[in-house]
Amino acid sequence: MTEPSRIQVRTADPYPVIIGRGLLGELVESVTGATSGVRTVAIFYQPPLAETAEVVRKALADTGIDAHRVEIPDAEAGKDLAVAGFCWEVLGRIGLTRNDVVVSLGGGAATDLAGFVAATWMRGVRIVHVPTTLLAMVDAAVGGKTGINTEAGKNLVGCFHEPTAVLVDLATLETVPRNEIVAGMAEIIKAGFIADPVILELVERDPQAALDPAGPVLPELIRRAIQVKADVVAADLKESSLREILNYGHTLGHAIERRERYRWRHGAAVAVGLVFAAELGRLAGRLDDATADRHRTILEAVGLPTTYDADALPQLLDAMQTDKKTRSGVLRFVVLDGLAKPGRLEGPDPSLLAAAYSAIAREESPSGGAILL
């Protein structure tokens, strides 16, 4: 069996992202080595992963650890204050202390919620992330962001809490629905546009091979996307400057998610947001036509949407006012000044926003709705 590869996230408290197959042994080692005297572990998992959670529990129990499974709601429904409260109650009931560890098992919503719970329980306990979706592997699990949603917006309540380790078990991708792979490609393609054009070349060479979890291309894309994020996070953990580039496509994307009450997959919303950001860059005279057009072509090649409701702009603008990058009511977007040259666009004129939105507007219902809902 091929040895796992490791990417070190070199923040003040460095941690590894381990990429491979069959990483149960690595998980046990990461948990037992997280802190001295680990006695209790809480495994937060989403319903489809009950069997996997039990395998993890037994493996930890075999080392003498008192391991507990804690089921949380699937997808964005889990990123709720009431769910976080339930998790805190469980941690209190099982007696989880600062010497103990939390494990997250699931998609991005699971890593966001479990990370938030770990960050706030006793002002911070160790957590090991085991992302099981493509999006979680290349984005949510790496970087230390945690959060829950409120009526005011997505991820507005949260904090930074870095994991002890992230275990990316590629074998889990062979059992997830294809739609999850497609949705996760949005974050990989984003990494290509902001930092690593080789990602774009690999996807464009054979889009279907890029979506094959059993083939050689997707693991390389995952490794490259994680490396991009690791490099950015190491330079700017708390999003004071450089890290904002990871939000490319997310300003409109988060607004779409909120308008759709989180029925759209995150990756689908970000895909539309990427095209919108490219159009903003083009119309602002900062991005060349070929690179702007490349956004739409590559996203459509893997089956992601690139348009949204024509009449939605007023609602989306309202939602974008709560975006974390907005300052004193001034909208701020990440745009490109060329391939792998991210920059910022502050306070764009309303006419520019309207023109960019007209380039992604559609009147009819979206095709391929299965990947959205």
From Swiss-Prot:
Top-level taxon of the source organism: Bacteria
InterPro entries: Dehydroquinate_synthase, DHQ_synth_AroB, DHQ_synth_fam, DHQS/DOIS_N, DHQS_C
GO biological process, one term: aromatic amino acid family biosynthetic process
Binding residues for NAD(+): 74-79, 108-112, 132-133, 145, 154, 172-175
Pfam families: DHQ_synthase, DHQS_C
Localisation: Cytoplasm
Essential cofactor(s): Co(2+); Zn(2+); NAD(+)
Keywords on record: Amino-acid biosynthesis, Aromatic amino acid biosynthesis, Cobalt, Cytoplasm, Lyase, Metal-binding, NAD, Nucleotide-binding, Zinc
Pathway the protein acts in: Metabolic intermediate biosynthesis; chorismate biosynthesis; chorismate from D-erythrose 4-phosphate and phosphoenolpyruvate: step 2/7
A GO term, aspect molecular function: metal ion binding
Family annotation (CDD domains): DHQS
GO cellular component: cytoplasm
UniProt-listed Enzyme Commission number(s): 4.2.3.4
Cofactor: record remark: Binds 1 divalent metal cation per subunit. Can use either Co(2+) or Zn(2+).
Alphabetized PANTHER family for the sequence: 3-DEHYDROQUINATE SYNTHASE, 3-DEHYDROQUINATE SYNTHASE, CHLOROPLASTIC
Family according to the record: Belongs to the sugar phosphate cyclases superfamily. Dehydroquinate synthase family.
Function summary: Catalyzes the conversion of 3-deoxy-D-arabino-heptulosonate 7-phosphate (DAHP) to dehydroquinate (DHQ).
Protein name from the UniProt record: 3-dehydroquinate synthase
Species per Swiss-Prot/TrEMBL record: Nocardia farcinica (strain IFM 10152)
Lineage: Bacteria, Bacillati, Actinomycetota, Actinomycetes, Mycobacteriales
